[in-house]
Amino acid sequence: MATTNSSGRKLFGPVYRLKGCFGEDSLMISDPVALQHIINSPHFEHGPLLENVIDMLFGKKSLVSAKGFSASAVRSYQPVLLRAAQELSERLEDSCAPASAVNVCPLLGNATFNAVVQAGLGCSTQDLGEEFVANNSQIVALSSSQSAPHIFAIGACLPSWIWRTMIYAPVAAFKDIRTAKYLTHHLGAKIVRGKLDSARQGLEINTDVFGILLEQYLGGKTRHALSEEEVAAQFSALVYPGQDPTANTIVFGLLELAKHPEFQEKLRVEIQSNPGASYDTMPLLNAFIKVCGTVRFATVDHNLSIAQEVLRLYPAAALIQRIAVHDAVIPLSDSIETSTGQLINQIPVRKGQVLTLAVASYQRLERYWGDDAQKFRPSRWLDGTITSHGPALGPYANLLSFLGGPRVCLGWRFAVLEMQVFFSELVSKFSFALSEDDFVRMRFSGALIPVLPNGSEKAAPMWITRI
């Protein structure tokens, strides 16, 4: 379980020093008070790795506006997610065979890809063309490969101008990235033109993220509205981060359900007890409304508790880089002992210091999540194991799976609803069991991904039975 950094925390504590690329000093941090300070302080920005990757893949203008992911906007995307989940069910039915396991990774990847394209851009993946769909598969595969993180880790220490030069290197990975940048720029502009033409004809366009942003632009009611060019630039920032991380998290959730058939059945009973009910009376929708309204919940149903538990154990971004842009002092929850025996309750850092936020390790702290924090136990969210003590961190259930502060993932409501819809659809129609021959493991490859025991192939084979 090295990907969660829990072993390092148990050996050295919630803050310790380690060597990074080319021998530079870095701090590994899972202390909640320190994490809260770092994610909210203007003295810390994206680390060099993330900053360079964002620039290379997405460009400087690709900062998604929060307008398209407000609580009301996300509610309107629920039919899109339901259709995507139902289409996934149909594909699973076609894939199920009595004597063979099904690898759910590509199926879920395609489903989340379809969902984010429909909700974000207002079109289907087929509308984007075969070339983009094929290139998207290459980009997703690149993010899951073993070699790519090694390239990016070294590249994190290089100046930005070298990164901009590297993209033109005659390497297959960089060729795919060049193609992706061209296609996303072209398609983003094409979709914007189409929506603006529809708006001029009096047609409604505010049914997806792009449409909402363009309606704001056309209305001219706020100085924060994005221009046509800026809306088009959101294409890559919507599509790429909105598919694979959520798909991987859902895969890990299905694997945990397969390991815990008793809980799987309990969840199934809860879902199936509301056939044909109105949205207002469905536990799934009520859980969604609670999520949109507050981080503290008066009641939590089983479907929400599994979403929370999966996000706690399997955050897509298990490790996150930050860099100090000014000299700063980081406060700590408890005093720690230095190598010289001195007790300190804060850590001074210099400008340029690289920090690694150990999100997965924080979300396994026994103090906050219970003595069995390493285990999958959704009931911890129902039985009072988890209390509200400690600093408030992320936007959802005090988890950092979506980060927090000014750099919070703006699509967190969409991701949570997507998980709830997919789990409800799949668990109500299928039974999931582990494949006897394959034991799926975690690997950190820029994000947590499921892999086979050999560690080189992303896959999650399971026995799936139609109920």
Regions found by a protein language model. Give the residues of each.
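Conserved cytochrome P450 catalytic core segment spanning the I/J/K helices
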Residues: A180-T249, G384
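Cytochrome P450 heme-binding "Cys pocket" and the immediately downstream C-terminal segment
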Residues: Q126, P261-F263, G394-P395, V408, ...
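Cytochrome P450
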Residues: K19-S26, V74-R83, E93-Q118, D127-N135, ...
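Conserved cytochrome P450 K-helix/beta-meander segment immediately N-terminal to the heme-binding cysteine loop
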Residues: L319, S339, L357-H389
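Classical protein tyrosine phosphatase
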Residues: I29, H37-I38, D244-R268
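N-terminal membrane-proximal hinge/A-helix region immediately C-terminal to the signal-anchor transmembrane segment
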Residues: M1-K67, V80-R91, A111, A180-L183, ...
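Cytochrome P450 I-helix active-site segment
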Residues: Q78, L82, Q138-V140, E204-G211, ...
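C-terminal, well-structured subdomains that either form a transmembrane helix-short loop-helix hairpin
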Residues: E230, Q234-D244, T249-V251, I344-Y362, ...
